[in-house]
């Protein structure tokens, strides 16, 4: 499968199954397109000779050489490569039940009242509650017991607002550290917070114990304060920004992300990203499209898509400009490592929700991920009895890119792994469906990310200043020398 497109002055050809990315001239671009349409090299060459007959810089010999190059790349498996991965997908139901990550809902309550919140202002359409230390401790024991030989274990403190249960977070990390050596585990904690509860103690603790922190900010003050308000309806921007700045400064080079949501009301979301970068000093950025009912005022529309596509292109080109100036920023969805993975297992199966990754409620119930919490049809079990709804777990095991018929002809499927099961469920009623609007956005982001990779390879100045990413994928391994354990 081939995907071709033109962006920012580059002719880009992606060979889907080999993962090869080619930047080519006009002749090669047209030649590959004709072959992909089923023409023989001879017939394609004849068409190109007619098309380029008026150009002195394109001779019949040049066209012949071009087809020789195409044949050479094809023989090397870098063009028109066959799909060698389908067979991997059919064995997924028989894979192990190893769990590698938990999302701990330490608080089903929140000190903000964001109107677009999928979690119903932190209560997940149920009762408010805080996780006890005993429940959290059992969740960590459950993770260790079901992690097999995997060493690296991921735990995200989530809510609601997890800092409303900060004491339990501290106790749980202390407990995890106390059992790491005995079980040969390495816990990596993430704190996701709206910032209201950040104190100097929280900053010191996060910077000591958290592998990553995710800080919720939608960008410009007027954008952020449209939705991210407290229970009295007051905006949160002025209270959280200084705290975020202090935390990030204290983290030094440790991981963090500013995580925003854009809606129909701010499809010019690059202004929010640039505000966070230029005015506030944040360099690690993420901005997610809202997922809302179609009749919601903030829901994105089909009419918004051209504007969003323009925004993604604007962002990619501006990031290249910043790189050349030696002041790069990171955008989460443009992180792409073409050399080091993730492995094909991860590229087929995605996030592992419901199998390798689960969410734990304050009462110890297990769900496939945070977006399923509160739906009784998607309760997997609990941290004491384990996964008791094995049929549901098996259904999620089969939730991969090859299980989605709509993904069959999509060039981006080995980059999205079939997309989000929760979004598919909400859009189609089936976790094996596809959220088509999200697919369109994802494909555009991938085109921009690939274009940036091409630009960095072709421009030494960009390459010198580019932010380097190497995948730390542990999708099927134990973190030791690339050992694979499915």
Residue positions per predicted region:
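Acidic, low-complexity/disordered tracts enriched in E/D and polar residues
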Residues: 1-35
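Short capping segments at the starts of secondary-structure elements
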Residues: 33-43
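Conserved alpha-helical substructure of the radical SAM core
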Residues: 58-204, 209
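Local cysteine-cluster metal-coordination motifs and their immediate loop/turn environment
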Residues: 109-119, 368-371, 405-422, 474-486
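Iron-sulfur (Fe-S) cluster-binding segments and ferredoxin-like electron-carrier domains
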Residues: 117-131, 373-379, 414-451
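Radical SAM/AdoMet-radical enzyme domain recognition
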Residues: 136, 140-156, 165-290
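Short Fe-S-cluster ligation motifs
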Residues: 140-158, 396, 434-478
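C-terminal accessory region of radical SAM enzymes
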Residues: 306-340, 370-417
């Amino acid at each position: 499968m081939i995907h071709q497109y033109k962006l920012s002055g580059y002719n880009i050809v992606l060979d889907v199954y080999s993962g090869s990315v080619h930047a080519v001239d006009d002749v090669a671009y047209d030649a590959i397109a004709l072959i992909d349409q089923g023409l023989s090299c001879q017939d394609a060459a004849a068409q190109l000779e007619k098309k380029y007959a008026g150009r002195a810089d394109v001779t019949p010999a040049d066209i012949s050489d071009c087809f020789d190059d195409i044949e050479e790349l094809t023989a090397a498996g870098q063009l028109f490569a066959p799909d060698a991965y389908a067979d991997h997908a059919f064995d997924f139901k028989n894979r192990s039940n190893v769990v590698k990550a938990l999302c701990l809902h330490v608080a089903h309550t929140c000190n903000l009242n964001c109107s677009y919140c999928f979690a119903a202002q932190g209560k997940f359409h149920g009762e408010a509650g805080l996780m006890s230390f005993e429940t959290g401790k059992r969740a960590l024991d459950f993770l260790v017991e079901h992690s097999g030989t995997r060493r690296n274990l991921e735990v995200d403190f989530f809510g609601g607002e997890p800092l409303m249960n900060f004491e339990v977070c501290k106790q749980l990390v202390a407990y995890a550290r106390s059992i790491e050596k005995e079980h040969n585990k390495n816990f990596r904690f993430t704190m996701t917070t709206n910032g209201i509860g950040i104190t100097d103690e929280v900053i010191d603790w996060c910077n000591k114990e958290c592998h990553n922190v995710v800080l919720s900010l939608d960008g410009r003050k007027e954008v952020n304060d449209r939705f991210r308000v407290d229970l009295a309806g007051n905006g949160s921007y002025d209270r959280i920004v200084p705290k975020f700045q202090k935390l990030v400064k204290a983290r030094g080079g440790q991981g963090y992300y500013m995580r925003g949501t854009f809606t129909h009301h701010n499809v010019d979301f690059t202004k929010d990203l640039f505000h966070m970068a230029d005015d506030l000093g944040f360099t690690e950025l993420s901005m997610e499209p809202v997922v809302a009912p179609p009749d919601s005022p903030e829901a994105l529309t089909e009419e918004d898509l051209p504007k969003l596509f323009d925004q993604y292109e604007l962002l990619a080109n501006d990031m290249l400009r910043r790189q050349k100036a030696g002041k790069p920023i990171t955008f989460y969805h443009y992180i792409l490592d073409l050399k080091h993975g993730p492995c094909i297992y991860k590229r087929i199966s995605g996030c592992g929700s419901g199998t390798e990754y689960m969410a734990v409620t304050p009462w110890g119930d297990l769900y496939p991920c945070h977006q399923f919490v509160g739906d009784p049809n998607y309760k997997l079990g609990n941290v004491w009895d384990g996964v008791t709804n094995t049929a549901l777990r098996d259904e999620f095991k089969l939730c991969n890119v090859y299980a989605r018929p709509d993904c069959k002809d999509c060039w981006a499927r080995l980059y999205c792994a079939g997309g989000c099961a929760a979004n598919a469920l909400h859009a189609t009623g089936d976790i094996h469906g596809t959220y088509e609007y999200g697919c369109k956005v994802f494909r555009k982001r991938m085109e921009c990310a690939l274009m940036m990779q091409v630009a960095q390879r072709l421009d030494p100045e960009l390459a010198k200043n580019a932010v380097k990413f190497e995948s730390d994928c542990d999708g099927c391994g134990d973190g030791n020398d690339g050992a694979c354990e499915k």
